[in-house]
Each structure stands twice: as structure tokens, then as C-alpha cells.
Amino acid sequence: MMPATRRSASVLVSARGSAARFPASSVSFLHKGAADVCRRFSASLSPFSCSAFVSPSCPMASSSPFSPPLFSSLVSSPSSPSAGFPRSASSSASSAPPCSSAGVSKVSCLKLSCGERQQEGEPSLPRSAEERKATNRRELECLRALQSAVAEREAEADGGWTTWRGVSQRTWKQKRPALLSSRVTAAMSLEEEDSTSGPRGYEEERERRSGVCGERGQNGGEKLGRVQGVSTGDSESRTRCRRGLHFSPQTNRSFVVLLSCLLFFLVGEVQEVCLPSLQRMESSTDFFFFKIASAEAHTANPGDSSKSRRRSPRSSRFTSKASSDSSSSSRSSADSSSSSRSSADSSSSSRSSADSSSSHPSSSSSSPLSSSPDSSPEEVNGLRGRARVWTRRGGLSSRLREFLSDASALRSQESAADAVEEARARVRLLSRFARSRRQTLEALGGKSRRSEWRRKRTGMMASEARESHRGRDLNTLADREKKALKSALLAAQLSRRRMQSIQSERSLYSLVRPLLDESDAAGVYTANECVAVRYADYPKEFPGYDISTESCRCPDGWLPCAESDAVARMSAWEPVIWEENADEGCTSERGEVMLEHMNFYSCPQRTFVEYTGPRDATIRDKQCKRVAFVLCRAATSSCITGPWSEWTSCSVPCGEGYQYRWRIPVTGASSSTDKGAVTQRSSREACAPYHMEERRKCNLGACPEKITKTTCFWTTVQVDRAEGAFDEDQGSCKCGTGDDAIDREEGAMVPCTPEEAVASMDNWKSHFRQHCYTSLGLRRRSNLALRFHSYGHVVRLGLRDLWHLDCTGGWSKFNIFEAKMFCGVGAKILCRSRTDSAQVPFSMEQHNAESDAVTRISMLLKRQRRVEEASPQAFAEESLLLSEGGVSHLWISLCAGAVAAVVFLVCLTKRAAVGTFLRSRVSTATAGGETVSAKGSTRGSRNAGRRVFSAQAVREAVEERVHAFVAFARRQTTAVILATEKWMETAAEREVTQEMQGVSTASLRLLERDCKEREERDSARKSCPQEAKGLLEGEEDVPALLVFPALKTATDRVVRVARSTLSLETRSFSGAQRSAQRLWGKVRSIFLARGKEKRDEDLFYGEEGERGRIQRGGPAAFVSSLACQKVERRRARRGRREGDSGEGGDCGEARKANSGVAGRLDSLTEMERDDSFVLSAVEEKLLFPRGKRNTQEKLARINKAARTAAVSAVTPESFGSM
């Protein structure tokens, strides 16, 4: 027997004349010895001897038609000379190990099969027999040489069709019957010769050991022949090749069938692992074209394809797996068979990892990181129990839906191309791909002369075709055909370059699992947890002992919690205890939380303690009043919520942070029975005492001591995913355009680390929030809405070393597959300058980030070399930048204001000098008139009346000139002010003016009313003779008349440049109107935000009141009364200065006639007459769109609105009912 350490052996099966040697490796006994083979076969077959084995290097054994190729020859290096061709007899004999065994010598069969020479000590046969055996041996060697030559010739001709030892499949199928018949004939002749020279005593044994050997053709029509067995005679005990297994005719057939099955199984494994067959390549080609057809079908109707994908996710996974198989086989074209086996193993492992990642797409985001789900109470730190309510959209936004789906540029194409021309263009394109695919398949098996000649011929034909096309016409295709060819090219390019990435992205994002499952299958739950009731929130008489429950008192409808209820959900109430005792800590006086039957939770010890104190109700009442909290639960809970969400990622990239989860109350009314009465209230109100969000501690590792001092900038990835947007060295997306020259010119950028991003958060956080709001479709700009969004973890911001930040505020890491899928055109990433190298200390609480926007923009422009020198003053905040033409307006306004202020101050301080100057000018004019009259008196008395009249005429002329000058100054000042206001009016003021004028048709009536009021005022002044008399009655009134009215008007106009042409410069303010203005200034920013509907309502009421007063004749009497009262007040002031009592004038009748007008002055106090408060033009238009009418009614409406707003702003925050 051979030693058990031999790894390669061949089992000899003697089947009456045919020697079929099966290598032990072909029956999966690669590491077993011969004894183990015998034991395995002896268990199922009849006993037989297994003592002779032939080395696998024997050419007869390896070249037998029943023996498959050795596994070592198939996986050997292609550079070795024996990798694909049969070895000769001499080389096989030289390399064969010595065939030696205890007491067994070599015989002539080993010489024939293994090519070994006869050694000394062996028995010699008669010379005639040796000659015949030598002749047969030469014939067999010639047959082997012929087989090798045919195999080499067929390998050179068929290039890529070779299978076993250089013999092609086609040649093997054609030559197999002839080779089998020739070998059987040679074996039979050899056995006949041996039988004639053998001893006679073994004929019965020969007949007993005879077997049936049958050969099958393709259709199973060949005959079965009975072959005479080989008799070995006395040499059977001395040989190793002829000693075989003892078989019966029944076991012989079953053994052959068993080994044939093992042989076919091994051949299939070898073909699949080592070298793909032609049929497998053709199936891959068909699958490639199937992907193109599926991409075109998706282009024609993307909705149906997405629906079918959602129905059967297994098909998409199978497609992605098959595409990865084809891509891996094409990539391994230049490798050897051993390397192809390793690549197949690696591709299979990558497919399994891809399938696992696609089946669990959000496993990284939903994992609890460093915290376990059942964390200890000290690790859990919750929020205060309030029901967070915000408006959520039912679906995703359009941008996020496009990001998650496999949308492409093919959707926007029109399907207007002709069907025939489109098919023709597609056939052309697919034939081109078929040629390239065929070249790839030929390259897998090696290049041959035929493939090279075919490639040269194809190149020559292509060049000739191009030259012929140039000679004919440059535009040979029609427009429709060009359009069809372009669409087919895009479809093929999509399937060729991005099919695998799209399939992977589809499997990753099409079944994105939200953090909170809001579907109908998620279910609803009734929240009935223990709530920490704080006695400090209730009156002093409420805390105490309840005899009915034998526990501390809970609010109505609530019961004390048992220890089991409290332990079940400690995270619902323990954070409240720790938050309350955060400053002073838990002590024995105030650190006890009462439970059912006076049991309590000890906050210092963090354990539940059973009560063993006295049972007296008075003592227990005192004990209950000293505690801070009582755990209570609802007797009948009406709080209906959804399920808890998954935990978010950690809130910080390093150090100690928090993870969050939440649940949402179900919207709808619920009923609860309280002492027989049914109370209807919403589920959100019922869930107010419970925690709707919880948090727990997490830690992703220690923070670095130092980081690079730099600034991270918000950038967008500009490199396509197919062009390699992922940077393997940085572990993130590529910053920049992807062009090295442009990136060097603009400034090389690299991704930021999480610590660098935290240090410069002020530079990019506003962009990140805006990106989250836009992607998630949130109208309400709230940080809580981002943190507790179900798809907030999908929108991400890329960082270095596979880090990313999502919209929930969580920091986590990609796996390599997710990172490559994330990096593409449009992805957001934080980048910094590559040249920054200074190191600064880092801490999560305090960072030395530069928050100055001017400095950041200046540094950015310097780094990108867009300007030579960036001035900080030139890049101020957007709110400080002036609009176009604003600089000139500002300078002119400043100059005009300065001049007006100087003139005003001079007139105010030098009032006496200015008055003296003006009086001297008037006196000089009067004296000149008197001189002229004196000279005229000397001419005669008859002209005396004329001289007196002349002096009076001169004085009247001077007075008229003064009045004319004052009126002219007023008109010019008003015109200048109006022109300045119109010139300096901004676009916003013009919009307000147009809006107010376009609200109603009242603006047209206002102009007519102003003209009427001006005419009525002039007529009222004519009817009041005291007005003209009072203007020139005192000398002190002259300078005030000349200077102060125009100067005051000009100063007011310069200060209030925003006043429009409808301002109140020609009308006076009443006391009620001034009080309304003061009230408006106090409440307008809080309570009154009137829209267009409110303004229309006020305008309507104002028009109705105006129409009623016009019918009663009110405006004329009201205006005349105001004009007379103004003159009376001026005369009263002058009388007080002169010591006069100042009796009533001629305007008493007008005052009495106007006593019925609304807003009369008699009922106003001195405080209401204060005119120090001034409104802007926009506020005046909002408050008084129709002038100064109905003031008291408007005040009443404003006060009512203020009270309503104050009442609605108060919301009860107490818990429970008394």
C-alpha cells in the first residue's frame, strides 16, 4: 500500500480489457491517501483489492478519454510550457516519481503506460512477446504524438476555443469516436498477446473477472461489446499497474456510473472556476443587450419601471449582481486562470456585501453607535415633556425625490423620431457594441492569428468606409436619423458606463427606511407611562396623603405608579428628576420620588426602597408634603401616538454627545370619561404630559488636541461619478473641477475633517440649513423640524475620511460603497485650502474660529487669486452695501441737512438780530415813503391828499411786497421739497405709495377734496376779519411770520424725506389724532398687522363717514371752525404777553355750529393736545387712509384688537386638573 501522505493518486479499474484511470483529485480526494479511497468505496460496493496506483504524471493515465484534465494543470501559470498542452512520454517519464512498493516489482505494463525502462531483477518474457509489445508501444506513442499535433494545430486555428490540454471542443467532439476505437483496438491486441504468453491455470479466473465495457455515441446507438479480460498470470502479485479491484458485473456498472457523476460534477466546477466557457460568454453578451433594452424601456415609461421595481426588489438585486458578474469577468481578461479564480472570489464577496448593504441601507445611520439600546439610567438624559407639533408634508420634496430616484437626462427627450430610422440607428450602434464585445471575448482566451487578421481587415474596411463617406457627402444622415442615433447613443452610454452605479444606487435609495415609520403598517400605541408630578406646581393645600389609594395624592384621573410601571420606562421620568436637581443635587430631603403604597425611589442611591414607616395618616401626610415628586399614571389614557423612531446619529463627531428619537401624537379627537361625564379633547392635548422625544449619551471617540487653523467653505462636487469623483486617499469626494491646471490656478482644495468643520461652523452653517430646508421641503424654518424629520438623515454633507453630517445634526461615517454612491455632480462637501498648515488647540466647547464675514471673503478672494489685493472695506455685509446711485443721494442729503441745521441754529440763536435787521429794512422803506410825501407837500396844498395817499400806498406796497416774498418763499420751498422727495424716493417707498393708491378709488377723491378744503379755508379766512388784522398788529409777529414758517417747513421736509405728496403739511393735527398716533406707535409692532383686507375695510368705513358728513355740510363748518380757532389761539398768546385777558372772538358761532362733528376739541385734554409724536407717511396712510376722520372709532377698534391679541397669547402651562 502507498503511504497516506501522497496527495495525488490514480485509481486503476480493470474492466475486462479497458484500463480507465481516474485521478483521485477528480473524485474530491485531494488530501486523502489510497487507503481512505478504498475505505470509502468498500462501504457501498463489494469487497475488492486496492493496492496498485499509478502516478498522475503517467501520460497514459492523463490522456485517457475517460480521465478529465488535472486541476493543477488547469490553474497553472500560462507562462509554463506545460500549461495547456500534453506532455511527451519522455518528459513524463523523467518527471515521474519512482514507482516502488514493498515486494512489488515493475512489469511490462508500467513500461507501456509510464514509459519506464525494465530494471534489473525483473522477470523477462519470451522475445517474440517483447517484440510484439514494442510494436504496440510504438503505435500508441505515435497515436499520442498525432493527438498532440492535431491539438496544437487546432489551438492555433481556433484561438480561445481550447479547453483541456490544448484540445479544442470542436476537435474533441469530431475525433473522439476514432480515438476511442483506435485505443480499444490497441488495448485488445495488447491483451491478446499477453494472454497467449500467460500461464494456463488462470483461464477460469480470467473468465470470472471479465466485464462488460460499452461505448456510447452521441445518440446512444453504438453497440455493447464484451471484451475479454486481461490475465496477468504470475506477474499479478509482482506488479502495481495490473493489480485492480475485484468487481462483479453488477457492481461494475454502478461503480462506473458513480464515478461518471463525480467526473461530470468536477468538470462543471473546473469550467466555472478556471475559465468561462463560450456559452457563458454568450449569455453575458445577451444579458448586456437585455440591459440596454431595459434602459430604453425605462426611458419610454419611467413610472412603470419604478413601480415594477418597487413590486419586485429581488429582480433589481439580481440585475445588479449579474451586471457585477459581467463587469468582473471583463476586468479579468488579462489575468491567468489562478488570478481569475481569486477575482471571482473577490467579486462574489463584494456582491454579497453589496446585497447586505442594499438590504439594510440605513444600518449605519440607525445603529446606536457606542450606546446600547438598553442603556443604563445614568446614560439617558431626556428632554422636558412637551408635545412638539409642527407641520409636516405628506411626501418628499421634488429635489429629494429626484435625488432618491434614478432620474436621468433621458426623460426630457422627445419621442418624435421616426420608428424605422430610430431602429436603423439602434441596429448600427448595437452592432458596434457587438463587435467590441466579441473582441473582448477573444481577448479572454488569448490572441490568435485569425483574430489579428480579422482586426486588421476590420480596420481597413472602416478606413475605406470613412474615405468613401468623405468623398460622398459629409451629411449623409437625415435630421430624424441623427436624433434617433443620438438617443440610442445616450441609452447605450447609460447602460455601458452607469448601469452598475444606477442599479446600486437604486438598491440603496429606492427603499430608504425613514427614521420614523409613518405608514399604516407602523401601528398606533396608547401612551400610559409614569409621569413625574412636581408638587411645587400646585397650591400648598394640594400635596398630601390620599387615604383611598394609601399613597401620596395624584391629580384627578391619575393614579400612583407601582414599582413595575416605573422600572418599565425610567427614561420617561428620571431625566426630569435629574434636571430639577442639577444645581443642588439629590439629597435625602428632596431626592425622594414617591410611588404606590408610600414606596419611593431614592435619588442619591438610585434604587427603589420599600416603605416601612408608620401607618398613621397624619405622619404620612407630612411626609408627602415634604417630597418633591410623585410618579403618577393616567387611569384611562387617551394619548394615541405612533411608534418610536430610530436613534439619530451622534450630535458631535468626537467627545460626548447625544442621540435623539421621537414619536408623534396621532391627530384626532379622543373622548375620556371623568366621573360619568364624557370629555372630548384632541390627542395632542392628552399627550402633553408625556415625553415625545428622548435622548441618550453617545461617544465617537476622543477629540484631537490640535487641528489645522483654516476655514472650511461650502462647495459643490463638479466631477461626475463615472469619472472618479471619489478620492481614495482623502476618503471623500474630490474638491474642485477635476482639472489639475484649473485647480492649481484657482487654489488647491482638500476636504475638511469634522473637527475643522466644527471650528469654522459660522462660515457654512447658514448654507447647510438652507440646503436642508430646500431638499426636505420645509416651509417652517425651525431647527426642531430638521432634527425630528423622518428623512433628515438622507440629506448629507460630505467630509474627509468617510465622515458626513446629516440634517438631523448627526455625525457618522459612510461605508466605502455608500461614499462612492454619494460622490457625484451636485453633492455638497466642505473644502479648505491645501496650503494651510498652522496647528491650533481644539476643544468642542470653545473654538477660535474667525466669524468676521469681511475677513473670510477677503481671504477667499486672495486664495483664489481673483484680485490682486482685497480690501476689507470693499466686501462689507450685504446689508451695508448701497444701491445703485445711493452714494450721490446720501451726500446730497447730508449736505442739505447740514445747511438747514446751520440756518436753523443761526436763526434760533440770533433771533433778535434777525428781527432788528428785518425791522430796519421795513422802517427804511417807511421812512423813504414819508420823505417822498414831505417833499410833495411843499408843492401845494391841493396835492396834500394825493401825498398822504402816496405815503399810505408806499406802506401798503411794502407790506404787499413782504407778503409776496413770504408767499413766494413758501411756494419755492414747497416745490424744492417735493422735487427732492420725488428724486430721493426709493423703490420700496414707491411700491408702498402705489399700493396705497391702488387700494381704493379714494385716492382720486382725495385730490378733489384737498382742492375743496383749500377753497373753503380761503373763504373762512376772508370771513374772519381778525386774521388780517392780527398779522400786522404787533411788531413781534413780523419776524416769526417772515422766518419761522418757511424754515420750520423746510426742516420738517428734510428730516422726513419719506413723506409722500399726500402728507399733512397744509392741515393741522387735532388732539385726538395725536393721541391716536401715540397709541399706534405703541401697538403697531405687536398687535396690529393689517393686510389688504383690513385696509380696504377701513377705507370703506372712512368713505361712508366722509359721505355722511358731506351730506350734513360738515367739512365746510369743520374747516372754518379750525381756521378761526387758530387765529384765536394766536391772539390769546399775544394778549397774554401784553397783559390782556383775551376774550372770545368772532369764531364762537362757528365753534357752536361745529359742536356736533365727531372728534370735537372741547372734550380733549391737554395731554391729548401734545404734538411731539410724529408718524411716518406709511404709518399715517395705514392709520388714517381717509384723513383725520372717525378717530374715536379707530381707537376703539385698535383697543379691541389689542385686547384680543393679548388674550389669545396667554396659554395655560399647568399640568393636570385640580
Curated annotation (Swiss-Prot):
Residue ranges crossing the lipid bilayer per the database entry: 886-906
Broad class of where this protein is predominantly found: membrane
Region Disordered, residue ranges: 82-101, 189-240, 298-383, 445-471, 1129-1153
SUPFAM superfamilies membership: TSP-1 type 1 repeat (SSF82895)
Membrane topology annotation: Single-pass membrane protein
Gene3D superfamilies hit by this protein: Thrombospondin type-1 (TSP1) repeat
Residue ranges with Basic and acidic residues bias: 201-210
Protein name: Thrombospondin type 1 domain-containing protein
Source organism phylogeny: Eukaryota, Sar, Alveolata, Apicomplexa, Conoidasida
